[in-house]
Amino acid sequence: PQPNNNMATVRNGSYSIPNSFGVLLEDSLVAATLIFGGVLERYPDLKICIAHGGGPACFGAGRWDRGWQVRSEARINISNPPSTYLKKMYYDCITMSETALRFLIDTVGIDRVVLGSDWPYVTWDPSPVSWILNERYLLLSFSL
């Protein structure tokens, strides 16, 4: 998704909302479309990486699963709850928050999170590598 051309631009192009929020919505929509469209079920070996930690996709997994349980149209292309497929994709670490990164890792597993930079749209200070190496949660939990 582009920071200046996404679904949030149409609704509210002010206050940097398209970059700060719209990009995350688009990331989640990509994940939902791949999952509910059955792409990951039809192609189980396909490797997909969703940017920006998947946006709110993992946070919404419970709602997606509930929708799959109670709405027949959500089960047309997939035979398992959507959260199952979230754990088959990869995500970059660009969450900009230790809490969000921790939630992502706890939801999909550290083996599904890769280094990202968000370049050229956002300049990192410190660098992505420095940021990860300074995350107490990662250092304490995974012996980086």
Give the predicted meaning of each segment.
Residues 12-38, 42-43, 47-144:
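H/E-rich (His + Asp/Glu) clusters that bind or coordinate divalent metals
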Residues 1-6, 119-121:
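Short glycine-enriched loops at secondary-structure junctions
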